């Protein structure tokens, strides 16, 4: 939008630009940045303030307007960008989402209904997480909101923050394995790559391997084929890496997994 207004080419942003350009309060994981040791942390600004949960209906409306603009190959109105995108997010993913804060400053990821949805994706993801917990899986803490829309909004509590708000280093399996978007069963990558990382780099190896096995079996049982490397993560503890709570589990009713389940098959 800025490039169009200033009549200049779009500037290409590097991975580091995305990492440092995010609001400091909501940046995923434990990284914070300064220009020099004696300066303040960068991107601590009121203009980048994370919206409160009470504004959820306005955020859903902004998300829908941005999606509508994309469908029509148009630039969205700046007011929607200011409301939803300007605070910054390092969350990624295909669905419309944003960071929000509860009254006690707890951080949540809010996943909004999409204009393309033909079923209640948020409610099904909530149901999947409840099933996962019943199956003994360490799953992210989530809840759903009925906001007057056709479908529910899912709220997933950020697990890279302690109860007191302290930061915990997080990295996706894709990052820790040195892979790229699109690396999956089609490029001969799969769960055994994650197994190798756990054996070589994690603490409490046996427990993490058992946890991963439960997640593989569960994803197959519910038909969650969106199990790519970004949807598996690790937290860094004082003793080493451990699997993060499971997240983004949603039935997609696909016969094949995104990742190889064995050395040769993703079925």
Regions found by a protein language model. Name each.
Residues 1-267:
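Phosphate/dinucleotide-binding and metal-coordinating scaffold of catalytic cores
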């Amino acid at each position: 939008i800025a490039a169009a207004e200033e009549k200049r080419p779009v500037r290409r942003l590097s991975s580091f630009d995305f990492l440092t350009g995010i609001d400091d309060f909501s940046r995923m994981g434990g990284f914070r940045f300064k220009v020099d040791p004696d300066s303040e942390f960068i991107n601590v600004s009121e203009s980048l303030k994370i919206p409160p949960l009470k504004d959820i209906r306005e955020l859903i409306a902004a998300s829908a307007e941005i999606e509508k603009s994309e469908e029509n190959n148009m630039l969205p109105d700046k007011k929607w960008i200011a409301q939803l995108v300007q605070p910054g997010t390092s969350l990624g993913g295909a669905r419309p989402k944003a960071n929000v804060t509860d009254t006690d400053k707890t951080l949540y990821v809010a996943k909004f209904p999409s204009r393309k949805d033909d079923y209640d994706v948020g409610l099904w993801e909530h149901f999947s997480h409840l099933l996962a917990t019943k199956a003994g899986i360490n799953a992210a803490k989530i809840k759903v909101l009925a906001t007057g829309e056709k479908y529910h909004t899912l709220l997933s509590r950020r697990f890279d923050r302690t109860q007191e708000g302290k930061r915990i280093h997080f990295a996706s399996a894709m990052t820790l394995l040195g892979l790229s978007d699109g690396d999956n069963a089609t490029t001969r990558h799969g769960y055994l790559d994650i197994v190798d990382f756990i054996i070589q780099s994690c603490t409490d190896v046996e427990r993490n391997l058992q946890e991963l096995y439960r997640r593989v079996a569960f994803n197959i049982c519910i038909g969650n084929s969106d199990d790519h490397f970004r949807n598996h993560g690790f937290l860094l503890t004082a003793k080493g890496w451990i699997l993060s709570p499971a997240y983004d589990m949603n039935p997609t009713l696909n016969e094949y997994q995104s990742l190889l389940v064995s050395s040769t098959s993703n079925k």
